[in-house]
Amino acid sequence: NQPFSDGVSARDIADLPQEVKDHFKELSNAANRHGGLHAASGTLGSGANNNVRLALLNIVFKSAGLPEQYHQARFVLRLKKQGIFDQIKDKVETAGDSWDEELEDLYVSRSIAGGLLEVDSTLGDDVKGVRQLLREQYPNVQDVTNQQMVDAIHDALASQGQFPLTLVVLDEVQQYVGSDTDKA
């Protein structure tokens, strides 16, 4: 129930029956106890090589403000976990590069590898070594296991050990699955 720019929320505008208002209040109270609320929505099948787990992760990552691609999101999550995300991003941008463009070229980005080397010299002897480490540590995968998917969702959404009450809305599921029993 995020407020609009004028401070009014959707719940304040809508004329809702008392029972519905009570349910929303209960939801808000539960959210306060469990790390907040989070919603993710998107269309299955867009950019995940016909892999339902990666398609779901793309949607969740995007909703959390992360890159949609698994390897890039895991890299950003690792930087955030180590507390060096802002430092690395600043170093990339100070070098005159766009963070998003460099992240897209993660394996060949001189500014990302150089920034990592400046922040943690134990990652490699030179930029070339750090690039190789990035390729090995964050490979571009074609699939993930169920456990890797669950772990990635938890890492993307949990904050301070709490997982928010989460709603995931998937559009075009029937079209995505079609008659493919592997997807079903």
Model-assigned labels for residue ranges:
Residues 161-181:
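Conserved P-loop NTPase "ATPase switch" module shared by AAA+ and STAND
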Residues 32-38, 130-131, 167-170:
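Surface-exposed beta-strand-to-loop junctions
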Residues 1-15, 139-142, 154, 174-184:
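Signature of the SF2 helicase/ATPase Hel1-core->accessory helical subdomain module
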Residues 47-52, 126, 174-178, 184:
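Flexible loop/turn segments at secondary-structure boundaries
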Residues 1-108:
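P-loop NTPase motor core
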Residues 2, 54-61, 151, 155, ...:
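A broad, structural surface signal
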Residues 23, 69-167:
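Mid-core helix/loop region of P-loop NTP-binding domains shared across ATPases and GTPases
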